[in-house]
Amino acid sequence: MTNEELAKEIALGIIKTGVEGSYGSVSCSTAGDYPSMGVSQWEGLGGRGDLLLSYLDGGSYFAGRSYSDIKYRGELPALKALLESKQGQIAQQMILAQDCLDRYVPQLKRVPTLDDSRCFIYAGIWCPTSEYVVRQFLTNRFTRCNLRSLEALKNLFKDEYYIGAGVGEIYKDGYANRAENTYYYVAGIDLTTPYGVPIYGEAGNGR
């Protein structure tokens, strides 16, 4: 698979597993009074959230505004509907795929032995937590974990990622559930029809 194809599938995985949010997600950023929007919680008020809005008919109405202003005017449902529209979904897929291509794929390419397509996509779906942490986590463990095995990779994230990410026991169960859900998603996607990747379980290296 090409870098662009890998980025596209990572983006779809992030969206379909809902690890960051849904198309219509709108919340107040923890960093300030501006909205965090969509499947990657892009932030508005001059950030990438405003870039997303610029692609949408009527999006300019919400661009550059604080979360509290939108909320107190009772316009959160309208913003949510705009993000959930077909146009909103396509724009989010496009921006997220570009983010994956620019940020996640280059970092994962630096991990030794991470050259199976499904395993690469699996790791990519974890990258919103921090692509740098994911890269270092896998690089530190590739000599004792088969990164070409989707099941082994799942168990590694399930058992150890909360340690590698330095977030403590409070995230252990949540990360374990995320590891399982992501595993079942990636194991079930069809990479054979569009890309010619061998069916899952029939080849050790699918890229």
Predicted segments with their positions:
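Cell-wall polysaccharide-cleaving catalytic domain and substrate-binding groove, primarily
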Residues: 1-112, 117-120, 124-207
